[in-house]
Curated annotation (Swiss-Prot):
Gene name in the database record: cmk
Family: Belongs to the cytidylate kinase family. Type 1 subfamily.
InterPro entries the record matches: Cytidylate_kin, Cytidylate_kinase_dom, P-loop_NTPase
EC nos: 2.7.4.25
Protein name: Cytidylate kinase
GO CC term (a single one): cytosol
Length: 231
């Protein structure tokens, strides 16, 4: 009987949303690893389909062309938080999807409804298959992808803090330019008609501006453990 209870408690689904530079990926991976949960970076999937389109000559400025090509690539995400993977048509895409070119085009591609429908279905299938529980990070997880998640968390931070973190991740990047790029991405993601970046009404908001990564991780772990106990 106790084993069944433990399984029920461990199979929690956690949705972590928020804009770039708030610590979503680092926090989500660390929390999943610490609690023995699977991990899914949904942003990587949108980057992957964007990279595929750029590589295959799709005009990413043309929504109709994007919609027509959306179902062609086969995207597979590995959910081990210690070593998450992503492949496109069997090819490792973990490096190529992080280029500046992909970063500058991903919002346009991900705003196309046909793309979001396909990727959302993929994300839901991965979450459903994670019988031991999963941490899913993105921009519309709590509102659109997994509205029935056991716990929804929305990470925020000031534009300055986010830009500083992003600049630290990318060698030679300009802080001011990074800040402007983040603000532009926020506007694009929040303003799109299909599944915009938004905080779910029942999400717990965590402002990470003045917190260290470890403090954010500890905060989220506490929230997840509290949800498990209440389950």
């Amino acid at each position: 009987m106790s084993t069944t209870v433990e399984t029920a408690r461990s199979s929690v689904i956690v949705a972590i949303d928020g804009p770039s530079g708030t610590g979503k990926s680092s926090t989500s991976k660390a929390v999943a690893a610490k609690l023995g949960l699977s991990y899914l970076d949904t942003g990587a999937q949108y980057r992957a389909i964007t990279w595929w389109m750029l590589t295959n000559g799709v005009d990413v400025g043309n929504p109709e062309e994007i919609a027509t090509a959306a179902a062609k690539p086969v995207i597979v995400s590995g959910t081990d938080p210690a070593a998450p993977t992503i492949t496109v048509d069997g090819e490792d895409a973990s490096g190529p999807i992080r280029t500046q070119e992909v970063t500058s085009k991903v919002s346009a591609v991900s705003a196309v409804p046909e793309v979001r429908t396909l990727i959302t279905a993929l994300q839901r299938s991965i979450a459903a298959a994670a019988t031991g529980g999963i941490v899913v990070e993105g921009r519309d997880i709590g509102t659109t992808v997994l509205p029935d998640a056991d716990l929804k968390i929305f990470l925020t931070a000031s534009p300055e803090a986010r830009a500083a973190r992003r600049s630290g991740e990318v060698k030679g990047s300009d802080l001011s330019a990074t800040r402007e790029a983040l603000i532009k991405r926020d506007a694009a993601d929040s303003g799109r008609k299909t599944s915009p970046l938004a905080k779910a009404d029942d999400a717990v908001e965590v402002d990470t501006t003045e917190l260290t990564l470890q403090q954010v991780i500890e905060c989220v772990v506490t929230l997840v453990e509290g949800k498990r106990v209440a389950a």
